[in-house]
């Protein structure tokens, strides 16, 4: 029954596979990070990542390479990372084992995920997406592109 439900969820989200997590999105995010990083490995992450990302980095022994998101000057909230910040990070750390993107951010801002995925893949770097606040975006054409639609390698969503 669980496998059937996971298969149905994968089909709904356009994913090859879906695995349910009893630890919520935090557990899934930690699994994603620890599946690509080991001791001393670099992972590119936005500075405003969820604490589960930092926990996974600590547990795996990886080294975070921070990309600073744009900050809204009027509201003081973070928008997300840009293609330019990702490009700079990839040029300086082409040996990174992964790139993590928040899509959408905790304030609802979406990255140009398709371009970011294409750029990271040109460096043979997998893209992991924290999509905890974007489970709905896959299901409407007028919403930003979901991680799976953009070609990301893994995504953690919350239902």
Residue ranges of predicted features:
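Conserved PLP-enzyme active-site core in the AAT-like
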Residues: 11-12, 27-159
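Conserved N-terminal alpha-helix of the aminotransferase class I/II PLP-enzyme fold
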Residues: 1-27
